[in-house]
């Protein structure tokens, strides 16, 4: 059996008196895209810092690429590429120079580093921007350059922290296509994201954490079927509490978030009949998705 590229076992981390990671366990299989989801403050960033050996756990065990962390984190990181949440590209360098300089951090010779640049530029679709300064790039181009830079050491594992935050839909879809191509090449990916569509499209499995604890784990479709299992009618109106009292008898379950009432239904027709022709209301009937799972598990929207 091959060694899991990432393995967390009963990991804990405290800051002062607050337990920010509480007995967290998960593992990532070779060639898998594994998502780590949770609201702000759930412990995702601390988890990534412990994985990379930047922060030391107070209890539990961590291994990365078969190496114990933090004791051999430096060795493990030689086989890891990291895309941070915020771009840390060098603005004084060109696109090409950013790749060349970063390659030298991994001990590559100047000749080997120069040989890497053309295929990385092609991968990032930045061939025409090789000699442009970072400040001349769009947000999507910067994210693709950061991803290309993370590949200079041909890593086995990629750790991506919010890889498409701040990108427009077109740039986000291009980033997803690049990530899928890496999975097709056998790379292992751990990613945090606030975008449920992103998690559903990319992740083979995911783990939802809240207050440092794992509250669900599994394939996206499995979680949707287990936690929701039916269609959803979203109703937008001025008095969701009154609407809930009226429509609850015709739904399997109802939830309110802001001014929106969510009705989870096996048969939508009774609710459709009662909403038809009403003024001041908007509603949408759709299949259940990961956003519904998140709301169900945490009681909060993802972006809080």
From Swiss-Prot:
- Gene Ontology terms, cellular component aspect? plasma membrane
The ABC transporter domain is annotated at 6-236
Question: Quick one: which residues bind ATP?
Answer: 38-45
Q: Name one Pfam family in it.
A: ABC_tran
Q: Cite the SMART domains for this sequence.
A: AAA (SM00382)
Give the family, as the similarity comment puts it. Answer: Belongs to the ABC transporter superfamily. Lipooligosaccharide exporter (TC 3.A.1.102) family.
Name by which UniProt lists this protein: Nod factor export ATP-binding protein I
Q: State the species of origin.
A: Burkholderia pseudomallei (strain K96243)
Give the gene symbol: nodI
């Amino acid at each position: 059996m091959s060694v899991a590229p990432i393995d967390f076992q009963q990991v804990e981390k405290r800051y002062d008196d607050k337990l920010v990671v509480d007995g967290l366990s998960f593992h990532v299989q070779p060639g898998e895209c594994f998502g780590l989801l949770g609201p702000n403050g759930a412990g995702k960033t601390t988890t990534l810092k412990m994985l990379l050996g930047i922060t030391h756990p107070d209890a539990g065990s961590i291994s990365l690429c078969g190496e114990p962390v933090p004791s051999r984190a430096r060795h493990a990181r030689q086989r890891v590429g990291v895309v941070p949440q915020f771009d840390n590209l060098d603005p004084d360098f060109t696109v090409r120079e950013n790749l060349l300089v970063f390659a030298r951090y991994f001990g590559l010779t100047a000749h080997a580093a120069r040989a890497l640049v053309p295929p990385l530029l092609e991968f990032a679709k930045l061939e025409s921007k090789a000699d442009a300064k970072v400040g001349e790039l769009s947000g999507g181009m910067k994210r693709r350059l950061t991803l290309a830079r993370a590949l200079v050491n041909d890593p086995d594992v990629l750790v991506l922290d919010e890889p498409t935050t701040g990108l427009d839909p077109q740039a986000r879809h291009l980033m997803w296509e690049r990530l899928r191509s890496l999975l097709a090449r056998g790379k292992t990916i751990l990613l945090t994201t606030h975008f449920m569509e992103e998690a559903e499209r990319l992740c083979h499995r995911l783990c939802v954490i809240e207050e440092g604890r794992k509250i669900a784990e599994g394939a996206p479709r499995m979680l949707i079927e287990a936690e929701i299992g039916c269609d959803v009618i979203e109703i937008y109106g001025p008095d969701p509490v009154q609407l809930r009292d009226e429509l609850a008898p015709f739904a399997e379950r109802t939830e309110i978030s802001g001014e929106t009432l969510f009705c989870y239904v096996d048969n939508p027709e009774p609710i459709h009949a009662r909403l038809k022709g009403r003024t001041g209301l908007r509603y949408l009937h759709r299949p259940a998705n990961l956003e519904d799972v998140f709301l169900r598990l945490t009681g909060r929207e993802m972006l809080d």
